[in-house]
């Protein structure tokens, strides 16, 4: 519920080459020790160059955010009618009331609450963050996000249905100066001896290139052989206003491309291949922003011949936002329409 976003090549070759020649062809030192001074200057130059290169590398974010640019412009459609009322009770506490009427998802009322703490690490981020929603039957979705230091952040999510914890997940991210290390534990159970552990590492190689890997390990009685491990390699390349990102592993291939064509238009392309299911899906999406009209439109089409889009229009000066959603599947010959109103 909140908004968040060069190494100097110089001439290192000459300094390193001179130093190398000096080592290969040693000569008697003159009485004024000029060679020592020159060698020391060359070494200092190399050290300063390496320091400048390291300083230019920034934290690459997490592997979870690898495809974020492309995913953010894709339309999230809904069916039926939805009304949401957001009310801020203070600078740190907000509540929401949502009424949903649909034939696809369960209809009814949900109450939500969000608390943002006072521990600030940037002008746009404060911790801890507690958010969740609950329906009259007691089904609960809860999330807790806390940043313990400038580099260490933890996220916990849990889902409760019919008085039972059906899903839980704890993620810890350590953000170094030019790398991020993440560890996730999901659905651990000492009664069934099952769970999922995922380790991720992402390293900035150059200011434009980040490479990393992911290891997922699952164990339990329902897993073939009682345990399975999947290794993947990930990467992201940024060039100006475009971003290439990809994941390659035993389970399949996932490639995304994002381009900011202008201040009003963003486009993205995604190809996801599952080796286990022996299928691929390609998606082309775009987002149009018209600030003067208070309008945002997200649309797209995929290789399954589905066309989808969401239109969001802010009804200024009133604190209302109108949302219209549509999805058409030409293969199955069905159409879903949604209409929503957000107040506050």
From Swiss-Prot:
Protein location: Mitochondrion outer membrane
Keywords: Ion transport, Membrane, Mitochondrion, Mitochondrion outer membrane, Porin, Protein transport, Transmembrane, Transmembrane beta strand, Transport
Membrane topology summary: Multi-pass membrane protein
Gene Ontology CC: one annotated term: mitochondrial outer membrane translocase complex
Comp. bias regions, Low complexity: 1-23, 31-44
BP GO annotations: cellular response to hypoxia; monoatomic ion transport; protein import into mitochondrial matrix; protein targeting to mitochondrion
Tissue-specific expression: Ubiquitously expressed. In the male germ line expression is detected early in premeiotic spermatogonia and is persistent to the end of meiosis.
Entry superkingdom: Eukaryota
GO function terms (MF aspect): porin activity; protein transmembrane transporter activity
Classification via InterPro entries: Porin_dom_sf, Porin_Euk/Tom40, Tom40
Region named Disordered: 1-44
Subunit structure: Forms part of the preprotein translocase complex of the outer mitochondrial membrane (TOM complex). Interacts with mitochondrial targeting sequences.
Function: Channel-forming protein essential for import of protein precursors into mitochondria.
Family named by the database record: Belongs to the Tom40 family.
PANTHER family found in the cross-reference section: MITOCHONDRIAL IMPORT RECEPTOR SUBUNIT TOM40 (PTHR10802)
Protein name as annotated: Mitochondrial import receptor subunit TOM40 homolog 1
Source organism (scientific name): Drosophila melanogaster (Fruit fly)
UniProt lineage: Eukaryota, Metazoa, Ecdysozoa, Arthropoda, Hexapoda
